[in-house]
């Protein structure tokens, strides 16, 4: 009887902890949803060539959209001063300019909204003393990453305003990668508040090994996201629109045509796409193997469900990637592919959480 009572203590503490922190977890998950939307809108902004349509960074005044014809003419004239207009969109009409302007405008507006949705509840929870010191430091760290992301976004845009017609693929990849880091941090903290303690029916040693495997997969997915940023940055997806071979080659002959050799991994369309495919193939083989290993353990229902969702998202994301490639990067499928990357990453994080 005493044993049952003592076993119920950790459960009671866990339930109390979860109940106290549930509003904070919900708030963070809402922020995750907004960051997810931000990543998707950012993808559309890139795919439609809209990212350089606003050539100034005005965090406060920039919230107000153009109102009359005169405002629009001023914005278009500023756009005409950058290389992209001269070399890519020369002769663009005002209506055509509006089409690219609104995507960039809403992308920036969504960033400002995320800042408010994060900052205001954070201050509220701090004032109400709902956040302890450790959690407060984590949340402050996330806020700092968000501020850095705003600066990174403008730093990326600057790379396309002077000498280039597109933004730097390095800065684009850093901007995308930082968005995933912010998303992961908020998701991890939120899910930790919802389920801070997990118990497993399997032996701890096997679960620990599986957890290390899960983290390896999560890291590999993140590397694939960064690789996708490079693919997008140099428009590598519009070449080699065949599968599974690259225009008939397993290893294309143009892999190392640039000097010095390491430039090929960042600037060579052939090598950048090959690397993205290679990482995808590693995941295609690794995640089913992980799923098979997980099935051999007596995980909780939610743990098994997380593993099933990871495998399902892999299949969906692989299908979206292949379709996007074969159709030469159409807007709909390319956007879905970017959204799928977030969902696959989320599934991997959820698996890691359930194994913690």
Curated annotation (Swiss-Prot):
Catalytic reaction(s) noted: Fe(II)-heme o + 2 A + H2O = Fe(II)-heme a + 2 AH2
Binding locations of heme: 276, 337
Keywords attached to this entry: Cell membrane, Heme biosynthesis, Iron, Membrane, Metal-binding, Oxidoreductase, Transmembrane, Transmembrane helix
Localization (cell): Cell membrane
Entry's EC annotation: 1.17.99.9
Cofactor(s) annotated in UniProt: heme b
Record pathway: Porphyrin-containing compound metabolism; heme A biosynthesis; heme A from heme O: step 1/1
Predominant place of localization: membrane
InterPro entries named in the record: COX15/CtaA_fam, HemeA_Synthase_type2
GO terms, molecular function: metal ion binding; oxidoreductase activity, acting on NAD(P)H, heme protein as acceptor
GO biological process, one term: heme A biosynthetic process
Enzyme class: oxidoreductase
Transmembrane annotation, as ranges: 24-44, 106-126, 139-159, 174-194, 214-234, 278-298, 309-329, 331-351
Record-level GO cellular component terms: plasma membrane
Topology with respect to the bilayer: Multi-pass membrane protein
Function: Catalyzes the conversion of heme O to heme A by two successive hydroxylations of the methyl group at C8. The first hydroxylation forms heme I, the second hydroxylation results in an unstable dihydroxymethyl group, which spontaneously dehydrates, resulting in the formyl group of heme A.
Alphabetical list of PANTHER family matching this protein: CYTOCHROME C OXIDASE ASSEMBLY PROTEIN COX15 (PTHR23289), CYTOCHROME C OXIDASE ASSEMBLY PROTEIN COX15 HOMOLOG (PTHR23289:SF2)
Subunit structure as annotated in this protein's UniProt entry: Interacts with CtaB.
Family: Belongs to the COX15/CtaA family. Type 2 subfamily.
Protein name (database record): Heme A synthase
